[in-house]
C-alpha cells in the first residue's frame, strides 16, 4: 500500500445528529473518501449510515460500499430493525479491511426485522438478502423473502392441572435466480407435565410433533411433507442452603443435578428440499447428565 494517511473531519450538526468525513489515502494502492452520518431521533429510535468510495489503482477498481443501521421501538412492544450491507466489488474487504473476520467472510447479509411481543409469545417477520463475496454474479445464492414466525414460550395451559405447552411456527419463502427455490412451513407443538416424586425429585415427560411442509415452486407443483415425533423425560432435583455472612447479608448456594433422555424418531428425508439446517436432522437417542451450581448474594 505504501505511505498511508487518514484524515477525518467531524461535524456536530445538532445534539441529535453528527457527521464525519474522512480522507483515506493509501499511496500506491489509491485514495478514497468515506462518510458517516449518525442520528438520534429519540430514546427509542436511532440509526447510522456509513458509505465509502475508493479508487483502487493497483487493481483498477472503483470500490463502493454501504452500511445502514436503524432501530425503532414502537409502543406496545413493537420493535423494528434494519441492517443493510452492500459492496459493489467482491474483493473490497480483502483489499481494504483490517478486520480479519471481514476479510475472510464468504457471505454478507442484509436484514429487516419486525416483532411484536406479548407476555409469553412473540410474532415476528424478517427478510434476509445475501451477497456471495467470492462471486457477486452468483445467481444460486439463497434469499429469504420473507420469514414469518410465531413462538409461544413455555406456558401453563390450565390452572387446574399442571399441563404446560410450547409452540414454534415459521413460514419461509425462499428465492434464487437460478436453482431450487420454494416455500416451507414448519410447526413444532410440545406438551409436558411436571410430576413431583416425593419432595426432592421432579420427573417431566415431554412429547412434541414436528410437521414440515414444502412447496417446490420452480421444480414441481407437488407439495411434500415431513413428520417427526420427539420425546424427552427429565428427572431433576434442587438442593439449597443459605449462609449468613459475618458483616451482615446472606448468600444462597443451589445445586441442581438433572438427567435427560431424548428420543427423536427417524424420518424420511430423501425427497425433502434442502435450504438450511432446518431441513435435515438425524435420529436422536440421547442421555444427558448435568450438574448446575448457582450462587446468589443479598447484601
Language model: regions and residue ranges:
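Outer-membrane beta-barrel proteins and related beta-barrel translocases across Gram-negative bacteria
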Residues: 1-299
Amino acid at each position: 500500500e505504501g505511505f498511508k494517511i487518514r484524515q477525518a473531519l467531524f461535524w456536530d450538526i445538532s445534539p441529535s445528529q453528527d457527521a464525519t468525513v474522512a480522507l483515506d489515502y493509501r499511496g500506491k494502492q489509491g485514495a478514497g473518501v468515506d462518510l458517516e452520518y449518525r442520528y438520534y431521533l429519540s430514546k427509542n429510535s436511532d440509526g447510522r449510515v456509513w458509505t465509502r468510495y475508493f479508487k483502487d489503482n493497483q487493481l483498477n477498481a472503483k470500490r463502493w460500499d454501504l452500511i445502514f443501521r436503524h432501530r425503532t421501538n414502537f409502543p406496545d412492544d413493537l420493535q423494528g430493525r434494519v441492517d443493510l450491507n452492500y459492496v459493489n466489488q467482491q474483493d473490497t474487504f480483502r483489499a481494504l479491511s483490517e478486520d480479519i473476520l471481514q476479510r475472510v467472510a464468504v457471505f454478507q447479509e442484509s436484514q429487516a426485522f419486525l416483532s411484536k411481543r406479548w407476555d409469553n409469545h412473540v410474532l415476528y417477520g424478517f427478510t434476509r438478502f445475501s451477497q456471495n463475496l467470492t462471486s457477486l454474479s452468483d445467481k444460486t445464492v439463497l434469499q429469504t423473502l420473507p420469514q414469518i414466525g410465531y413462538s409461544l414460550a413455555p406456558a401453563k395451559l390450565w390452572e387446574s392441572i399442571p399441563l404446560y405447552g410450547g409452540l414454534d411456527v415459521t413460514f419461509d419463502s425462499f428465492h434464487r435466480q437460478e436453482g431450487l427455490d420454494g416455500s416451507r412451513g414448519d410447526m413444532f407443538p410440545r406438551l409436558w407435565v411436571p410430576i413431583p416424586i416425593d419432595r426432592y425429585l421432579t420427573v417431566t415427560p415431554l412429547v412434541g410433533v414436528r410437521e414440515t411442509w414444502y412447496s417446490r415452486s420452480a421444480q414441481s407443483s407437488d407439495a411434500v411433507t415431513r413428520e417427526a415425533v420427539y420425546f424427552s423425560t427429565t428427572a431433576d432435583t434442587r438442593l439449597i442452603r443459605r449462609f449468613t455472612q459475618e458483616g451482615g447479608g446472606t448468600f444462597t448456594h443451589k445445586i441442581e443435578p438433572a438427567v435427560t433422555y431424548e428420543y427423536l424418531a427417524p424420518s424420511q428425508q430423501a425427497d425433502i428440499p434442502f435450504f438450511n439446517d432446518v431441513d435435515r436432522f438425524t435420529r436422536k437417542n440421547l442421555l444427558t447428565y448435568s450438574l448446575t451450581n448457582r450462587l446468589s448474594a443479598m447484601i
